[in-house]
């Protein structure tokens, strides 16, 4: 979950690209359907994901892209491009716990870095905007939990053990004395994650229920 600190010129480049996307969305307003405009929002989380992916590729730790907070931006982008509400909601529900974990284990330990901030804060902002349009559906937490289990399994199979992506290989450092084995830690972690996703879904459903969603697009 570490991130690459861009030199001064590079944040400007990213902000410039984001401004271009925003200008294009405004230019297209009235010339394309609202559904197409809604799909194009997916360019933003895709950019957030690619910024992190380029960083990890450069430092030869590409496995870090499978952290839930990073891969979630890619899932949100795909959901928007395909106009798939379920994929959008799965990605969005993960932005809340992802933000807290990032703040506790990255910001407090290492400080604020540009691409990491884009992935977490930027992803959250886009996610909340999208959620206003589609609303949070009951039962989303179950799909989000299943998504977590799949990504954690992929992390265990395809990423290096020293990266410990999604805590798929060993106990989180500092917690070794509390658990007798990794699988005891994994079981507790899995239960905590399931409960957290359930609580986050309830919170988001109360704020943006589906029946009050402001979408003007027809989604599948």
Regions inferred by a protein language model and the residue ranges of each:
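A contiguous pocket-lining binding segment that forms or flanks enzyme active sites
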Residues: 109-152
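N-terminal membrane topogenic signal
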Residues: 26-44
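Membrane-interface transmembrane-helix boundary segments in multi-pass integral membrane proteins
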Residues: 160-200
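Hydrophobic cores of alpha-helical transmembrane segments in multi-pass inner/ER membrane proteins
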Residues: 71-80, 121-132, 186-202
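Cytoplasmic-side transmembrane-helix entry/capping segments in multi-pass membrane proteins
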Residues: 88-96, 116
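Aromatic-anchored segments of alpha-helical transmembrane domains
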Residues: 46-54, 95-106, 146-157
């Amino acid at each position: 979950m570490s991130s690459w600190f861009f030199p001064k010129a590079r944040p400007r480049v990213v902000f410039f690209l984001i401004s271009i996307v925003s200008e294009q969305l405004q230019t297209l307003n009235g010339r394309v359907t609202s559904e197409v405009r809604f799909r194009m929002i997916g360019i933003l989380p895709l950019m957030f994901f690619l910024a992190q992916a380029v960083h990890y590729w450069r430092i030869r730790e590409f496995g870090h892209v499978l952290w839930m907070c990073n891969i979630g931006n890619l899932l949100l982008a795909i959901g928007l491009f395909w106009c798939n509400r379920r994929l959008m909601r799965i990605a969005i529900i993960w932005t809340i716990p992802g933000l807290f974990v990032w703040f506790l284990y990255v910001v407090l330990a290492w400080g604020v870095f540009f691409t990491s901030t884009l992935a977490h804060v930027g992803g959250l902002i886009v996610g909340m905007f999208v959620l206003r349009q589609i609303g949070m559906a009951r039962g989303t937490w179950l799909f989000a939990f299943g998504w977590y289990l799949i990504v954690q399994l992929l992390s265990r199979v395809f990423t290096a053990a020293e990266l410990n992506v999604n805590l798929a290989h060993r106990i989180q450092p500092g917690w070794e004395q509390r658990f007798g084995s990794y699988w005891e830690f994994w079981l507790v972690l899995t239960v905590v994650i399931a409960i957290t996703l359930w609580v986050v879904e309830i919170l988001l459903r109360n704020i943006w229920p589906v029946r009050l969603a402001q979408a003007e697009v027809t989604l599948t």
